[in-house]
């Protein structure tokens, strides 16, 4: 499949037409706007309420080589971009060689020994072959290599004949805010539902009815629903995709055992946190794979299986798309507009035809290797970028961060 407009054009037009309330276009360093969905002032990273394009638009001078990306124009998360999976102010875990930050009580940069303000574990973590040592960093080339291996390992993905997609009307990025249904037919003409009898698909589907989409309403799991989370993790860990991912992360000194890895996946993906007031109303899994509604708009919802099932029930109305990826087989990528039972999604990117474990693996890989950053991968010889965000308002374990969101932002450099 091919992009209906050049991706660079889509980027520029998307940024130019991004609504004042949803983008930092022409808003960088403005004062706090209480009426805006997201913020672009200098303190928004501290408060976790930046617009998604804040880092690309407002920190360009600090990151001059940051690639232009196909950006979603909606508020996805209150988690600000972060350089580390950890929020442990008294530790160097995940912080080795970071830039000096006057707000930290101790430091992990190269000059902290000179000034005598290193964290106590600086020497053990940053001076040797520790978890965060610079020589232990995962390179772009390594990410591209392992993502190709994961791509080849996805034997549970849909075959060409398993899905008939009717993408119909392709619009320009300037039209995404119009909320006009330009596609009279459903997106999915046919899906071979035998796919859903496979263990990982079946376990994945069992999770989707465990959530209520409105933020502000607390999530409370039954014993059965908690068991379904364990079943899903157990089933995907049997696949070549997840074995490839774990083997890579183990080799990179991220995890010492599969048990540690699975435990961390459960926390980062299924751990609950609050996107609204005090209620624990959200998780990375719910946001990314099931979808949520906040302030009258769809957020998250980046999964084709969820989309198909909701469309089949008449709850999703496909409106249009602005991007169709270059892959001529599955998985592919589609960036689309749709209405979810009364609520609009302005730009939602999703893999199409991938197995649950494939998406889970790539998003996890990028969150672990490039938390809060753009993650450059390669699939079938085509470049692909994934953006993740960390949840910064609460943590688990020793200051580790939850997943706020993860989604495809580009399939070109």
Swiss-Prot record:
Organism domain of life: Eukaryota
InterPro entries referenced in this protein's UniProt entry, alphabetically: ENDOU, EndoU-like, EndoU_C, SMB_chordata, Somatomedin_B-like_dom_sf, Somatomedin_B_dom
Pfam families: Somatomedin_B, XendoU
GO BP field: immune response
EC identifiers of the protein: 3.1.-.-, 4.6.1.-
Assigned keywords, A-Z: Disulfide bond, Endonuclease, Hydrolase, Lyase, Manganese, Metal-binding, Nuclease, Repeat, RNA-binding, Secreted, Signal
SMB domain mapped to chain residues: 20-63, 88-130
Family matches, as CDD domains: XendoU
Name of the protein this chain belongs to: Uridylate-specific endoribonuclease
Species in which this protein is naturally found: Bos taurus
The gene coding this protein: ENDOU
